């Protein structure tokens, strides 16, 4: 009696590649190609924190979960996008990739843009009236593209959310910003230490508005 057997081969590559598969005469051929040979544009999206690193934590709410929820809403938009864009995500579950692997994904894929999504907290971690949206960029980027992208993200978010403008902020002390070789923006959507914003950030409609604003910013920037 014959049985259908399934085999799995896992390959670990040094670079980010797309796989093109062809078959002929019962042989399967795999070609590993640069993402830019397949897609018109390449985007890397990062959900902050994850796993045993929750980020800001307030009233039983973890930043890592809010960051991921927004990213998953953003993924829905990119999945429906009719443009030829390759989008890579540093995480789509409750994992915690290293800082090096996060920025490495952007650099190794030579992404057209790298977007990292976070939420903010006061320095003390105490609840306060401080609120608003800010976006970090790489001041060391001599092309000015990082700041340009950050400004676009901020503008779209302010219009969509009606949040307070906390401006664009130099973020070179942040590893994934400092080490990025591609245009990068790290978005702090809102303050979890503000009662109203914490409530908003947990709201599905608010998360969808956030995702749509960032989607629009990415599309406008890369095209």
What residues fall within each predicted segment?
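Signal-peptide-cleaved, periplasmic/extracellular N-terminal interaction regions immediately downstream
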Residues: 1-43
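A generic structural micro-feature
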Residues: 3, 127, 179-181
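Generic detector of short, well-ordered, non-transmembrane alpha-helical segments enriched
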Residues: 5-7, 63, 183, 210
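Residue-level marker of positions within ordered structural domains that often coincide
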Residues: 14-16, 72, 140, 158, ...
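Short beta-strand
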Residues: 20-22, 166-169
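Catalytic-core regions of hydrolytic enzymes
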Residues: 29-163, 174, 199, 208, ...
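Active-site-adjacent mobile loop/cap segments within catalytic or ligand-binding domains
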Residues: 123, 136, 167-223
């Amino acid at each position: 009696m014959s049985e259908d057997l399934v085999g799995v081969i896992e390959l670990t590559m040094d670079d980010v590649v797309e796989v093109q598969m062809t078959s002929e005469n019962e042989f399967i051929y795999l070609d590993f190609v640069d993402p830019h040979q397949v897609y018109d544009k390449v985007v890397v999206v990062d959900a902050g924190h994850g796993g045993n690193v929750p980020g800001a934590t307030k009233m039983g709410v973890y930043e890592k979960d809010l960051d991921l929820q927004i990213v998953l809403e953003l993924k829905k938009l990119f999945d429906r996008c009719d443009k030829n864009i390759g989008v890579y995500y540093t995480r789509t579950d409750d994992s915690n990739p290293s800082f090096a692997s996060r920025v490495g994904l952007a650099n190794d894929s030579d992404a057209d843009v790298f977007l990292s999504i976070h939420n903010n907290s006061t320095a003390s971690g105490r609840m306060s009236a401080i609120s608003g949206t800010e976006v970090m960029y790489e001041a060391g980027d001599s092309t000015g593209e990082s700041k340009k992208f950050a400004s676009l993200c901020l503008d779209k978010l302010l219009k969509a959310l009606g949040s307070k403008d906390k401006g664009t902020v130099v973020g070179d002390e942040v590893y994934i910003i400092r080490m990025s070789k591609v245009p990068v923006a790290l978005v702090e959507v809102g303050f979890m230490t503000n009662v109203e914003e914490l409530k908003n950030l947990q709201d599905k409609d608010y998360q969808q508005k956030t995702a749509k604003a960032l989607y629009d910013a990415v599309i406008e920037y890369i095209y």
